[in-house]
């Protein structure tokens, strides 16, 4: 037993130094680790709770990638671009503001070029017109009115040139530069001062039982109205009541003029219709017909009284008889009427007979200045004695309000049957349409009227050509004619309500009235239709200083040979 114990003891003794050495190493390592943990804990106590630098250091250690420079740029550059795009408004950086002048330069250049060409054309036109004025004044002693008119046309043309040059530089409705309007007080086409205070008149105070039977046979309605006005003068001189002819012998005057209004204007009965005369004539009650005691002819040539057998037959059909032969107090030719005085008329046509007739006095030339003055030679309280009846006047006013307005030019463009009539005169008054259009355009330019009313008997082919040639400043000036009857239009309602529609004489008087109310009137030389319009304009106070005959002071640039 003792032997076994000895061997164990011996083994333990031999291993003891090595074990001590290992134990010592373990103790040192343990102490070292304990010291490290202690130091680490002390440092942790000294650091803030969220140490960013420590976190970044640990992240770098955790996520450290072995990337090259190119790889880094490839990865991070798109991210940077996306972030910048989301956080920045690029609209202000990429929108380019180009000045308006850059876009307008081409347009403005074109407008300037166009206006320069227009101004050059107008300057050449002005030069031509000035030469024409110069040549005209050298060869003729022009009146001051002609010179004023010509000068104004050039001023108007000069104004157009100014506007043409300034037009590219205008914006909106701004007017650049001055105006010459201030130099023309009252405008370029002022109303004519009729000086009514200086009228020379005669009192018409007829004897109630003495009558003058009007005989008007020459020409159309306008001739008859002028003839009727002269008959009024004769009736006033002879102190007689004037009998208006029957529509069965003459025109239907009661549809065109207001006969009762004439009596109102004078404050007494001075005119009666044929029907009224028939009722009150004392001879008719005895003999059952109207008797003309004396028939006096103003003209003896080419035939007495300008009355033929046909008219005598018509008078008899009315129940009118003529006593004795046609009487002629003097030698007077229609082709060459002489000037007569009021005293001569009174001396040669005075009679004690109850009913006398004088015919035809349309061509009579008695106290012309007296007869032609505004309002006529008879004293009255109206503007004129013979004027359209109230229905026609109102219809004309409604037409003007509907289609024309206040400022318009009226043109009486006589064509039918006028070519032969005018070419028999020297100079001729029948103008080619292009020449007529040129004359009309000049007046439109002067008046500055936006529209032209056309009273004409011309064919559509002629009026169509005229319309196409009426161009001012590149714009067509509209021609307005009375349209055909349309139930949708109400301006002419008064006429058809009173049964006057479709009457050619009513329509002619309506045309006259519209022309008489215009701002400026262009008439046809030699036409009594025009002369009656001028009479109305003079009496109504609508006459303008610019009123004229078509192409006045000009001759047709082409005249056909005679047959």
UniProtKB/Swiss-Prot annotation:
It is a single-pass type II membrane protein. Keywords: Carbohydrate metabolism, Fucose metabolism, Glycoprotein, Glycosyltransferase, Membrane, Signal-anchor, Transferase, Transmembrane, Transmembrane helix. The chain crosses the membrane at residues 73-93. One of its GO terms (molecular function) is peptide-O-fucosyltransferase activity. It is found in: Membrane. One of its GO terms (cellular component) is membrane. It is an enzyme of class 2 (transferase). Residues 1-25 are annotated as: Disordered. InterPro entries: OFUT2-like. Pathway: Glycan metabolism. It comes from the Eukaryota. Substrate binds at residues 412-414, 528-529. PANTHER family: GDP-FUCOSE PROTEIN O-FUCOSYLTRANSFERASE 2, O-FUCOSYLTRANSFERASE 14. Belongs to the glycosyltransferase GT106 family. This is O-fucosyltransferase 14.
């Amino acid at each position: 037993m003792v032997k076994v114990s000895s061997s164990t003891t011996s083994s333990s003794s031999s291993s003891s130094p090595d074990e001590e050495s290992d134990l010592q190493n373990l103790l040192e390592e343990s102490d070292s680790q304990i010291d490290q943990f202690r130091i680490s804990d002390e440092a942790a106590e000294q650091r803030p709770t969220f140490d960013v630098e420590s976190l970044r250091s640990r992240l770098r250690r955790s996520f450290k990638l072995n990337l090259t420079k190119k790889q880094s740029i490839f990865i991070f550059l798109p991210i940077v671009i996306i972030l910048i795009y989301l956080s920045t408004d690029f609209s202000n950086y990429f929108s380019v503001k180009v000045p308006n002048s850059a876009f307008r330069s081409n347009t403005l250049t074109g407008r300037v070029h166009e206006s320069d060409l227009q101004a050059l054309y107008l300057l050449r036109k002005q030069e031509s017109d000035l030469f024409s004025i110069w040549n005209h004044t050298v060869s003729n002693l022009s009146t001051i009115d002609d010179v004023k008119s010509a000068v104004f046309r050039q001023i108007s043309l000069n104004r157009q040139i100014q506007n043409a040059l300034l037009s590219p530089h205008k914006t909106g409705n701004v007017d650049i530069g001055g105006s010459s309007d201030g130099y023309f007080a009252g405008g370029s086409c002022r109303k004519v001062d009729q000086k009514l205070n200086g009228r020379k008149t005669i009192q018409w105070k007829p004897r109630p039982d003495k009558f003058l039977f009007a005989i008007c046979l020459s020409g159309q309605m306008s001739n008859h109205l002028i003839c009727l006005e002269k008959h009024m003068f004769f009736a006033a001189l002879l102190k007689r009541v004037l009998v208006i002819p029957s529509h069965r012998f003459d025109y239907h005057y009661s549809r065109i003029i207001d006969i009762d209004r004439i009596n109102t204007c004078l404050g007494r009965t001075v005119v009666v219709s044929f029907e009224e005369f028939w009722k009150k004539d004392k001879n008719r009650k005895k003999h059952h017909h109207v008797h003309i005691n004396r028939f006096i002819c103003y003209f003896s040539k080419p035939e007495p009284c300008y009355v033929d057998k046909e008219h005598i037959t018509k008078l008899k059909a009315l129940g009118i008889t003529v006593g004795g032969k046609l009487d002629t107090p003097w030698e007077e030719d229609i082709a060459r009427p002489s000037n007569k005085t009021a005293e001569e008329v009174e001396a040669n046509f005075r009679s004690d007979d109850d009913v006398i007739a004088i015919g035809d006095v349309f061509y009579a030339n008695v106290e012309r200045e007296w007869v032609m003055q505004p309002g006529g030679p008879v004293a009255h309280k109206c503007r004129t004695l013979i004027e359209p009846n109230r229905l026609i006047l109102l219809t004309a006013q409604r037409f003007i309000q509907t289609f024309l307005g206040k400022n318009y030019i009226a043109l009486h463009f006589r064509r039918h049957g006028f070519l032969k009539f005018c070419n028999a005169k020297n100079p001729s008054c029948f103008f080619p349409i292009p020449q007529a259009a040129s004359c009309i355009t000049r007046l439109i330019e002067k008046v500055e009227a936006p529209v032209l009313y056309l009273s004409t008997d011309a064919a559509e082919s002629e009026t169509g050509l005229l319309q196409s040639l009426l161009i001012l400043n590149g714009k067509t000036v509209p021609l307005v004619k009375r349209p055909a009857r349309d139930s949708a239009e109400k301006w002419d309602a008064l006429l058809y309500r009173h049964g006057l529609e479709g009457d050619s004489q009513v329509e002619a008087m309506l045309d006259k009235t519209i022309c008489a109310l215009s701002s400026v009137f262009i008439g046809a030389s030699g036409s009594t239709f025009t002369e009656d319009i001028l009479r109305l304009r003079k009496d109504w106070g609508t006459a303008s200083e610019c009123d004229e005959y078509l192409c006045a002071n000009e001759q047709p640039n082409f005249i056909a040979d005679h047959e």
